[in-house]
């Protein structure tokens, strides 16, 4: 049975789609057959980050409305044989995203022997976000170390606890993981960002990883490559750690402290 993971946040621009792409890619690189679905009807960015925008013929709404089947709509990733992308529609109304339609798509993906289905949610509490989280078994709650982002993530946790299938049917709670993106320890030390402790005190869910602030994320997006593929970068290493922890490995948390300056830099103010 496929495990369904929603990547969600209350605020836009926190790195949800970047995370969905790297998380799904990381699972596939570990040998797991994985599908990643873009639920952001009308905007559609996942295909750009995955580098497959020119190969989109059919999308999620086409499948839901019976205009195409999954075999026609799924795009096989060029770098991972067991990774597939299902794009969102740029032209359809969000109301075309129905609960019964989403349920059938997820069921059919499970029947195709997918082990993991990653649902890339739009920000906030609109239809796409509700549909992305409704059938989830686990959730990656993505937040930046700033007050507004953390507050909005707290609202999302409330929705996960009340608006999902598991919550409505009184089943086991969705397993929630906190992922902090764009973290800069030096700015935390200067009081410009919330600390890990501050964020965890507010949200009170288990931390699965810290993604450092880095220009390599923008470079990866512009190249149409998931950041996890940016070999040698801190961001790539951080996402690999997240995947390892998700799959049960005990990995120390990295990228949480500012690098110590050497003696010469401290003496002469070098940068």
Predicted regions, residues:
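Walker A/P-loop NTP-binding active-site region of P-loop NTPases
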Residues: 4-69, 116
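Flexible glycine-/small-residue-rich
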Residues: 9, 38, 87-90, 121, ...
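Residue-level signature of catalytic and energy-coupling elements of molecular machines
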Residues: 12, 63, 86, 120, ...
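Alpha-helical segments flanking ligand/cofactor-binding loops in enzyme cores
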Residues: 25, 107, 130-131
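P-loop/Walker-type NTP enzyme "switch/lid" segment
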Residues: 39-111, 221-222
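Helical mechanochemical/support elements of P-loop NTPase systems and associated helical scaffolds
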Residues: 42, 56, 66, 70, ...
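Conserved catalytic-core segment of NTP-binding enzymes
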Residues: 111-112, 116, 122-208
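C-terminal lobe/tail of nucleotide-utilizing enzymes
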Residues: 167-271
């Amino acid at each position: 049975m496929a495990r369904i993971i929603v990547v969600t946040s209350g605020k836009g621009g926190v790195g949800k789609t970047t995370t969905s792409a790297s998380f799904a890619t990381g699972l596939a690189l570990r040998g797991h057959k994985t599908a990643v679905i873009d639920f952001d009807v009308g905007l559609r960015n996942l295909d750009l980050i995955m580098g497959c925008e020119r190969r989109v013929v059919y999308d999620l709404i086409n499948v839901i409305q019976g205009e195409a089947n999954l075999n026609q709509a799924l795009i096989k990733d060029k770098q991972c044989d067991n990774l597939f992308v299902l794009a969102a529609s740029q032209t359809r109304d969000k109301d075309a995203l129905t609960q019964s339609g989403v349920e059938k798509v997820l069921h059919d993906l499970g029947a195709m022997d997918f082990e993991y289905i990653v649902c890339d949610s739009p920000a906030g509490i609109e239809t796409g976000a509700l549909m992305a989280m409704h059938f989830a078994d686990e959730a990656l709650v993505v937040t930046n170390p700033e007050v507004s982002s953390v507050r909005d993530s707290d609202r999302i946790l409330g929705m996960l606890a009340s608006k999902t299938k598991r919550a409505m049917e009184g089943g086991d709670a969705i397993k929630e993981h906190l992922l902090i993106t764009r973290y800069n320890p030096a700015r935390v030390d200067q009081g410009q960002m919330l600390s890990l402790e501050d964020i965890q005190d507010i949200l009170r869910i288990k931390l699965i990883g810290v993604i450092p602030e880095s220009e390599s994320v923008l470079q990866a997006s512009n190249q149409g490559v998931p950041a996890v593929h940016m070999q040698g970068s801190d961001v790539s290493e951080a996402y690999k750690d997240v995947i390892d922890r998700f799959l049960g490995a005990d990995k120390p948390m990295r990228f949480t402290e500012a690098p110590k300056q050497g003696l010469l830099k401290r003496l002469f103010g070098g940068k």
